[in-house]
Amino acid sequence: MASTWAIQAHMDQDEPLEVKIEEEKYTTRQDWDLRKNNTHSREVFRQYFRQFCYQETSGPREALSRLRELCHQWLRPETHTKEQILELLVLEQFLTILPEELQAWVQEQHPESGEEVVTVLEDLERELDEPGEQVSAHTGEQEMFLQETVRLRKEGEPSMSLQSMKAQPKYESPELESQQEQVLDVETGNEYGNLKQEVSEEMEPHGNTSSKFENDMSKSARCGETREPEEITEEPSACSREDKQPTCDENGVSLTENSDHTEHQRICPGEESYGCDYCGKTFSQHSHLIEHQRIHTGDRPYKCEECGKAFRGRTVLIRHKIIHTGEKPYKCNECGKAFGRWSALNQHQRLHTGEKHYHCNDCGKAFSQKAGLFHHIKIHTRDKPYQCTHCNKSFSRRSILTQHQGVHTGAKPYECNECGKAFVYNSSLVSHQEIHHKEKCYQCKECGKSFSQSGLIQHQRIHTGEKPYKCDVCEKAFIQRTSLTEHQRIHTGERPYKCDKCGKAFTQRSVLTEHQRIHTGERPYKCDECGNAFRGITSLIQHQRIHTGEKPYQCDECGKAFRQRKKTSYKEILLKNHSEPQAGVNLLLSSLIPEWQSCFRKDL
């Protein structure tokens, strides 16, 4: 239904002034001219736009349509420039932040711009004998002076706005009240009397409602809810004319520059949005839509000059470049660790505060980061979507798969800046780097060797004899978890490390590396005493015991010491389990490769 809004008002000296806006069609040329040219109708349309209630419409589409119509009738974009519309918005907000007493005074002057408001206020300050001090709340002499000044200034000027009439304070003095009504009759009687305006009971009487309360009335107030006017302080220093930042008229968001106002208004209701032709998603800014559409088109126009990686948005590229520059502007106040992103610092600080906002619904475990919860959930779902193409082993996280693939490819992307040693895993590099930092070195009290904190814990098990990691198949125990993992490959037959030269496979990467030196002839480990070189570090350590005389392996029976640990023969395995022959056989078979196991089991 195409409808417009007419204005009806009635002036009566014997009763308080009330205003009602009724919905009806423009039926006369006079009404149309009023809508186009009259500044008072613009003020009424502004009020109605601000006080519009969603419940007055049949649905969201009609509500949006009416809001647009009222906004057009108020701001008139067909006749006003962007600068003029912006000035109207700033003027409205400026009048809103003024104290109530000054609002009534200023609006009676009917200013057309913010500069006129400043001029009016400065004139008032000069007329009062207290420069720089704004009018205080309802003192008798100042009230009389202000009213007399209002009357003198308004005589002979054009008509007064509805907003001013409605906001006019009601005073106890009958004489002042009579003078005020006479002024209103002179200024508004001719113009508004011709419009056949009638009094409404829905709006507040002009003597009971302040201008500020009317300007700030929320839409919910017109739907039956009430809100108390804000308390007015005597020294509104926060409302300085020079320092006040512009704010959004819809939601009160502060804006740093006036130019931000127009751009921000697109987010507010009633403004046109930009929709994606592919998925229908809408955006408040055209630039955001263009960047979003690159998801569908695959366009990545922003390319990194360092590594050639391309991105859809400029901000993502700028964030990426921090990787190359090494810039880390965000520093933790607790431990001094720096980060390239503020979000990364925010997540890191939760380690110090102990905040864990993300909880698992299955087991209740909490995490400080959303990514941690996401990966943890896969434990319950047993989801392992990332599979290795070399050995078909599956993983729950892509990062773990990437690190695992380094086992097959031989890639060691994590290199120590101090000594150049490379590692497959980042955690291994972190542990290694602690060796170079003296303040993080931990010395063994038994033998004096230095380790990282985790390395010292594992090393001390050599002296204590603790072996917490036990094999479920043969019950053999180990000091380190990695040693247990490597040992279990004996039972499973898994040999993930394969030589490219001869095809021989191994259970441990270190053994493969040492084996490959047979083909290359490389002997990187050299003895400082005699110059002998070896392919593996263990061979060098065993050799150096010849020079040092160290014999760490001692016989439990006779106490004799040896430089090397004697390998247990198959016969000794059976003899150790002579009380349980079958257990000895099973243990012996478990040490064989799977092909041999199947052959021997057939004969048993």
UniProtKB/Swiss-Prot annotation:
Keywords: DNA-binding, Isopeptide bond, Metal-binding, Nucleus, Repeat, Transcription, Transcription regulation, Ubl conjugation, Zinc, Zinc-finger
Gene3D superfamilies registered for this protein in UniProt: Classic Zinc Finger, DNA breaking-rejoining enzymes
Linked residues for Glycyl lysine isopeptide (Lys-Gly) (interchain with G-Cter in SUMO2): 20, 25, 196
Subcellular location: Nucleus
Keyword Lipoprotein found: no
KW Cell membrane (keyword) present: no
Stretches assigned to the SCAN box domain: 46-128
Biased composition (Basic and acidic residues): 213-230
A GO CC term attached to the entry: nucleus
Pfam families: SCAN (PF02023), zf-C2H2 (PF00096)
Lineage top rank: taxon: Eukaryota
Disordered: region residues: 154-175, 201-258
Molecular-function GO term, any one: zinc ion binding
SMART domains registered for this protein in UniProt: SCAN, ZnF_C2H2
Zinc fingers classed as C2H2-type: ranges: 274-296, 302-324, 330-352, 358-380, 386-408, 414-436, 442-463, 469-491, 497-519, 525-547, 553-578
Recorded family membership: Belongs to the krueppel C2H2-type zinc-finger protein family.
Function: May be involved in transcriptional regulation.
Name of the protein in question: Zinc finger and SCAN domain-containing protein 12
Species name: Pan paniscus (Pygmy chimpanzee)
Gene designation: ZSCAN12
